[in-house]
Amino acid sequence: MRIEEIDGTGQTLIPGVIDDQVHFREPGLTHKATIYTEAKAAVRGGVTSFMEMPNTNPPAFTQDLLEQKYDTAKHHALANYSFFMGTSNDNLEEVLRTNDKKNDVCGVKIFMGSSTGNLLVDNPILLEKIFEGSEVLIATHCEEERLFKSNLAKFTAENRVLTAADHPLIRDEDVCFESSFRAVQMAKKFGTRLHVLHITTAKELQLFSNMLPL
């Protein structure tokens, strides 16, 4: 067996990074990037495992579309890979079918506030059904849609051009906290594994505690 020895004198060796939230562009926008090109870039930067979000074109709303991503990655990804199942107000049955792949699929992604296309679940009954029925991890984009729309209406009523500076005013602390609070409460109620992505505010940290010794 051939063994390659690499001289690491003066270098720093760290484990490969796991990136749990990447946004690749395949399918639908492959003129921008593909699973191959993004995985290649990831490895180049020290990321050896990735978990990709469902907001491609079309979004990963069905098991067939999700399986197509896995098939592409099997042939072209240069890193370890997994993909999130997408959710909407109309695909509960498909979402719960992810339970059959719980050893392979990293989780179910829920946009509790609108962000991209129709990747949104703001129906409270449907949210509870997903949290209750999911045997895989649920990853959430937490913004309270009702409060967000109310804030947006106030700003657009002023008939001015919105800028980046308005973003934290429209998607403010209450918008974030109320949604994260709801997600945590549902996870506790149903014993669901929950990962709240990209926490925005310090207030939201009050919802979490780490009781495990480090």
Q: For each predicted feature, which ranges?
A:
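Hydrophobic faces of well-ordered beta-strands that scaffold small-molecule active sites
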Residues: 16-22, 50-52, 81-85, 106-110, ...
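Active-site metal-binding motif and surrounding structural segment of the metallo-beta-lactamase
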Residues: 2-13
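Histidine/acidic residue-rich metal-binding segments in metalloenzymes
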Residues: 93-214
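Short, surface-exposed connector motifs at secondary-structure boundaries
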Residues: 46-51, 77-81, 186-194
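Conserved short loop/turn motifs at secondary-structure junctions
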Residues: 54-59, 85-87, 116, 196-199
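A glycine-rich helix N-cap at a beta->alpha junction
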Residues: 71-87
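Metal-associated gating/positioning segment near the N- to mid-region
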Residues: 11-76
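Conserved phosphate-coordination/catalytic loops
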Residues: 29, 33, 60, 89, ...
